[in-house]
Every structure is written in C-alpha cells, then in structure tokens.
Amino acid sequence: MPAIKIKDNIFSVGVLNPSLRIFDIIMKTEYGTSYNAYLIKGKKNVLIDTVHGRFFDEYLENIKSVIDPSSIDYVIMNHCEPDHSGSLARLYEVAPQIKVIASNAGKIYLKNITNKETLDVKAVKTNDTLDIGNGKVLKFAIAPFLHWPDSMFTILEEDKIAFTCDFLGCHFCEPRMFDTKITYMPKYEKSFKEYYDAIFSPFKPYVVKGLDILDALDLDFIATSHGPILTREGLLAASKQKYRDLSSEIQSTTKYIPIFYCSAYGNTEILANEIASGIKSVLNDANIEMLDIINYDYSDLKEKINICDAFMLGTPTINKDALFPIWELIGGIDAVNCKNKPASAFGSFGWSGEAIPFVISRLKELKLKVFQDGFTCLFVPSEDDIKKAFKFGEDFAKSI
C-alpha cells in the first residue's frame, strides 16, 4: 500500500497484511488487517507509530515517498505493542537522529522492546504539547488500558484529527484507507464488533473515559492503527456510539447464572440439573441457563461466562483431567473483570477424580470467589448424591 494523503501535510504511511488470519494468538482475522502509521510534515516532521517488524521495508519505502528519513524529527509511540513498535529499532538505525515520545509506561516498555540504549525517549503526560511549526501543535492525552497501560492519544486540533492507535480500530484490510470507501460494510461491522470483544471488552470503564476525551474534541478524522480511518461524514460518530453502547453496564435485578457442563454418560448432567434446582429454590427469579457446551459456539460461551453474575462448571474426569472444552472455556474468562465473581465446579468421576480439584484451583488462581471445593460423586449419582447436589446448589445460591 503506497502512502496516502489524508490532509495537507498529513499522510498514511502504514502497510497492509491481507493474509493475516490469527492475531496475537487469540483472535481470528478473517479479513486480514493493516498496520497503520502516519506522517505529519511541519517545520518538524513527525511519525506516529511504526509497523510490525516484518513489514519494515515497505514502511520505510512509504516514508521515503513523502520525505527523506533523515529529516524525521520525532516518532510518537501511542502504544508499544510489537505490531506498532516492531519497526522502531530498525528505523532508529536508518534515522539515528529521531527523538521518541511516549507515555511514561511506554518509555519503560520501549527500553526492552528496542534494546537500544542510546534511543532518546521522552515521556509525556496529559495536556503536554509539541509545537512542530506551520501552525501545527500536537497535544497528548494519556489513555491507560486502551488497551495497554502505556496507551495514549495524539491530537492535532488544528486539523481536527486524533490518532488513537488501537482504540476504535478494526482488523479489516481496506486498501483505500477511509471508512467512506469500504466495499463490504457488513463484514467490516462484524470485524469491528469482534475487535472490541477481543481487545477492549475487558477494559470497559477505560473505554468510557477514552470516549469522553474524544467527545470533547471537534474531529473530522480518527486515525486508528488498524483498519480504515474514521471520518465525520462516515462512521466516526457511529463507531464512538457503538463502543459506548458496548461498554455500558447493563443494570438488572435478575441474576444470570449459567451452568456450563459436558457429560460423557449423563452422570455429570444429572448433577448439573440438581444443582440448578437447588439454586432456583433459593433464587427463584434467577435466570439459570443450562449449557451442554459441546453444542454451543465457543465465542457465545465466552460472552456468557464473562457477563454473568455467577457460574458453575461441570466436567467428568477423563485420563486424570478435566475435559478440553471446559479448559478452553476457562481460558476465555476475563480475569480483569471477573475478579471475585462467584463460581464453583462439579462432576462425576470413575477412577481418580482429578478434574474438579484442578478446575477449582484454576478458578482460585483467576481470583474468582470460589465456593467450597466443588462437588463430586463416584460414577452414577445415588439418591444421597442427588440430595447433596441439590444442597450444594442451595448453599451456592446463598453465598452469592
């Protein structure tokens, strides 16, 4: 992708990666992505962010098509994740005169990301400014946990543009770089929501704070680090509202308690039903959802476990362990926002019964509010086991 002019003396110099299908191990990217970076020309020339290290050569050529790299004065690192900072060390080798600007956390991170002891990095704070001449003054706003502790926004009020790095971005490879030129809008909208879910949903209070910063500005453009640039005539307002809607806490007087389970021969399922009945006997108005997880899409289960008020996990023990679908679901728990959420586990076993102790241990490591040590029975639940399972559900409900 060649350099693209956004406004007079402001250019997109990032690169496309249309073949990317998995990002950061955790996220599918069906439509590829872009690593966006920006160049502002003034009396001082400024780069905003770099790109993934594998794409440095293309990135450098895009810069060269606008200015000589030796004339770059500053590189602003809004966020130091390697897909944005990965080319900084090599850029420094080509342009050793550069001065880097980052948040205080970013300054610390860059030392160990670049391993360049002589790299000049200055930390800024909210409302600090950088006058680059020609009537352009960059203003900084620290925006922690959007989505790293180092994140910040760079704002050019004179040109009504905010550079927000990952915030409001999307893994969507649009070569024409503007939201008004998106060809497959439903696919973009799907990717936009998936990006929020994977990257920003753990940080909803910080998302709201970031939106408040942007809402106080008169903006024609929001230039993100992935996906098309958001424009006033395009999706800028709608994208902000979508993030605000997704980050608003849903108030409900009805507790949502899903029971996730898998059951090889129906014995763990029997326990699941009795525990549910026990919970219902105490919390009559609770929404208790029974979920045999092999029949559901993982992304749906992940959303449920993270939005619920409390949950139970049921698994038999097979080959001295819990079953993979349960471990996969546990891997989807948002440890940031699920801290102290009531949870427990149950299951039938036939030989050694390690599954439930393992699951309980992991839930404790995630800092959930774990009820007792779970509940188990040997093979087929007896009448006494069924009564105890019901009581376990009752007691769990009382603990919520």
Swiss-Prot record:
Fe cation 2 binds at D83, D166, H226. One of its GO terms (molecular function) is FMN binding. It catalyses: 2 NADH + O2 + 2 H(+) = 2 NAD(+) + 2 H2O. GO terms for biological process: reactive oxygen species metabolic process; response to toxic substance. Fe cation 1 binds at H79, E81, H147, D166. The keyword Ligase does not apply. Keywords: Detoxification, Electron transport, Flavoprotein, FMN, Iron, Metal-binding, NAD, Oxidoreductase, Stress response, Transport. Its EC number is 1.6.3.4. Binds 1 FMN per subunit. Binds 2 iron ions per subunit. Residues 32-216 are annotated as: Zinc metallo-hydrolase. Disulfide bonds: none annotated. Its cofactor is FMN; Fe cation. SMART domains: Lactamase_B. Induction: Up-regulated upon exposure to O(2). Repressed by PerR. FMN binds at residues 263-267, 345-372. Residues 257-397 form the Flavodoxin-like domain. In the N-terminal section; belongs to the zinc metallo-hydrolase group 3 family. Homotetramer. Consists of an N-terminal non-heme diiron domain and a C-terminal flavodoxin-like domain. Catalyzes the four-electron reduction of molecular oxygen to water. In fact, functions as the terminal component of an NADH oxidase (NADH:O(2) oxidoreductase) when using NADH:rubredoxin oxidoreductase (NROR) and rubredoxin (Rd) as electron transport intermediaries between NADH and FDP. Is thus able to reductively scavenge intracellular dioxygen and is part of an oxidative stress defense system in C.acetobutylicum, an obligate anaerobic bacterium. This is Flavo-diiron protein FprA2. It comes from Clostridium acetobutylicum (strain ATCC 824 / DSM 792 / JCM 1419 / IAM 19013 / LMG 5710 / NBRC 13948 / NRRL B-527 / VKM B-1787 / 2291 / W).
